[in-house]
Amino acid sequence: MKTTGRVNGIISNIVIVKADGPVGQNEICYVWTGDTKMMAEVIKVIGDAAYVQVFDSTRGLKIGDRVEFEGHMLEVTLAPGLLSRNYDGLQNDLEKMDGLFIARGSITDPVDYDAEWEFSPLAKAGDKVTAASWLGEVKEQWVMHKIMVPFTMTDSYTVKSVAEAGKYKITDTMAVLTDAEGRDHEVTMVQKWPVKQAVRCYTEKPRPSRIMETGVRPIDTFNPMAEGGTGFIQGPFGAGNTVLQHAISKQADADVIIMVACGERANEVVEIFKEFPELIDPHTGHTLMERTIIICNTSNMPVAAREASVYTGMTIGEYYRSMGLKVLVMADSTSRWAQALREMSNRLEELPGQDAFPMDLSAIISNFYSRAGLVKLVGGQTGSVTFLGTVSPAGGNLKEPVTESTKKAARCFYALSQGRADSKRYPAIDPLESYSKYLEYPEIREYLDEHIEKDWVDQVYAGKTIVQRGKEANDQINILGDDGVPVEYHERFWKSELIDFVILQQDAFDDIDANCPMERQQMMYKMVLGICNQEFAFADFEACSQFFKGLINLFRQMNYSEWKSEKFEGYRKQIEQYVSEQSK
């Protein structure tokens, strides 16, 4: 019998409930006000008083209103039909909702229970299976969606029977499994899993050993992201966080993209809704929306649901990872998720940490980031979840708690600089502040040596040194004036500008320059580095700046030319001739 209770106190969206039976931490309940039922989550239990966080506005709620406890945590529905859907943080399908604003208590089905799917069996009677073992598959968009033993079935089972190939609804029985005690268990295409728990149905979690191409030069060349890795973009408002995330989501070498718009402005989310169904995925030739799931909690939606949306996105990512797919989960912005945690902590009157964030903020963020990763599945295949979050601290403050905690958890850091954004150097990734710890991994070094070029990491560090020395030379020029420093200082500065303009800047709105394949990046970078390592003889600083401005212009035209086209090769020859005329 389910536990029930009555509302005993209200603090904004935290409701104190006097329960008449046992209540668990993180248990889901429904609070009734009139004919409307609102979902809520238990966040603290003291005696017979349960503190529940309501995922809707509590306006009109009164003392004595009825509460029903469900006996399970916040769960997501995992089944074929998730791809190309738009959900809110509680996995309600936004397309099925009417009106400009979401009505209070709106609950819709996350998947279509009446749709039929073409099933092909992969297992056979007599096979031994465990949680996440593949029983069959259906074609969802262009992805082969595996039907698995539910993650909750943790024992070892023997397959008694599997459905024959044909069309089935997701609620039909696909297989019957027998446990060690001889009991039969029916398995359908649908399963549920609590969002706060990591899916651990794999045999091994090795270190990342491959890079994930994004087509964005300052990331792939200077600070690569590993497949199954973690990273975050930090930058003040207006520095291009969202445009960079959209560029990565369009071009990343992943099978499934999950975008979590957590506390984002509504117009940025609408942009994704409008653009993605029209854009073509360069890897498959299908529309981008076919491989994308959007989980959206905009700024004007309830704060409590923001926290849930990030976990919902990660859980769906882990589900697709269990099918042996490469998944990219992107959250914009985790700062607003942390603000939701702060609001909850403050209402519970917990001891505040720095800037009133919860004391355990660092542990919460680290625990969440640890759910990403490359895994070896029970069948021997590999799957991965790569996580990329954004942090938007007030005033671009790098020392605030969310940035500090995320830096400890994530292995890649992309710092967007206000100065670079103001001077229109997009993407505004600061080459000196940003880093990728994956460059230190022997596995990644081996991969880069084998797939790009021998000693590639050393060449990357050489480029970073040129940029650093150019910045130092620029500081000296600004202090002493153009005539007050040797011409070598100007040469050093302009070499760093060459790397900046050609490699670190990229036009996200140009069809060709927006997506730069790794082969092209390697060729361009080698060319630029070769010029930077040459010695030139300039009469004065004006001759130096004129030469490099002309060179940068040729390279920029080359960036806008199609890879290996006549135009591209023409610019390459022009550059070689231009440089040879000036060389010592």
Question: Model segments located where?
Answer:
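P-loop NTPase catalytic core
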Residues: T221-F222, G228-L551, R556, K564
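P-loop NTPase nucleotide-binding/switch module
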Residues: M97-T152, K169-G229, L244-A247, P282-S299, ...
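N-terminal accessory targeting/assembly segments
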Residues: M1-A103
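Metallocofactor- and cofactor-centric catalytic cores in central/energy metabolism, strongly enriched
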Residues: S12, M38, G47-A50, H72, ...
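Conserved "cap/hinge" positions at secondary-structure junctions
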Residues: A19, T33, E70-G71, L90, ...
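Long, highly charged low-complexity segments enriched in Glu/Asp and Lys/Arg with interspersed Ser/Thr
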Residues: Q546-S583
